[in-house]
Design a protein with these regions (language model features):
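Transmembrane alpha-helices and adjacent helix-loop boundaries
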Residues: 1-217
Length: 217
């Protein structure tokens, strides 16, 4: 098999990895916000639900979570598994897993803002919403961006875990090609693609950090 054909097949697998990457961010970034506020809530049941959720998501392997979500409908409810079940379970597992990590990042960022800034904004006539949007959020965004960036870069590599439940992403394609062609070239090509994609993500995150440099702690 020629290198061109291998790259074409790996490219198709990469599109699946990219789709998983994008869907995970679109789902987990907003989901982490209410979880973070629950984690900081004065209502004890909400606070404990969030703490347990975050602890489970961070304390158990993502691969195990994928298997649990994939097989639970069958073993618990007797629902038959379909070919689409693998993809759905994979996306759901990635979203709820990363939401747990993002929630803790949001919480640490919000709690790092001195209480005096809220009080000063109130004296100046700002509403709670105005204080949050115009004073708190710009500072929080800058403070949490490096940690968010680390998780996003990790996500690029974690998409390869989808092969465990049979999702045809780039790593599973490379693994199949290595077995059929008896060659390490597919692994080398896929490693290069992962690195290039991560490099692009790092550049975008770096640009975002520079854009937020207008605020200095």
């Amino acid at each position: 098999m020629s290198i061109q054909v291998m790259m074409q097949m790996l490219g198709q697998g990469f599109l699946v990895s990219l789709q998983l990457f994008v869907l995970t961010l679109l789902g987990s970034i907003p989901l982490g916000i209410p979880v973070a506020f629950m984690r900081m809530s004065k209502i004890a049941p909400l606070r404990w639900i969030a703490r347990i959720y975050i602890s489970v998501m961070r304390g158990t392997p993502l691969m195990l979570q994928m298997f649990a979500i994939y097989f639970a409908p069958y073993y618990v409810f007797g629902i038959s598994l379909t070919p689409d079940s693998k993809w759905t379970a994979c996306v759901v597992a990635f979203i709820i897993n990363y939401a747990g990590y993002f929630a803790e990042i949001y919480r640490s960022g919000l709690q790092s803002i001195p209480r005096g800034q809220y009080e000063a904004a109130e004296v100046l006539g700002y509403s709670r919403m105005q204080t949050f949007l115009y004073i708190v959020m710009p500072q929080v965004a800058k403070r949490i961006l490096p940690a968010m960036g680390n998780e996003i870069i990790t996500l690029v590599k974690d998409t390869s875990l989808a092969f465990a439940i049979g999702v045809g992403e780039m790593f599973s394609t490379a693994k199949a090609l290595v077995a059929s062609q008896v060659s390490m070239v597919p692994f080398a090509i896929s490693a290069l693609i992962y690195w290039v994609f991560n490099f692009v993500v790092e550049m975008l995150l770096g640009a975002a950090e520079k854009k937020l440099d207008y605020y200095h702690d």
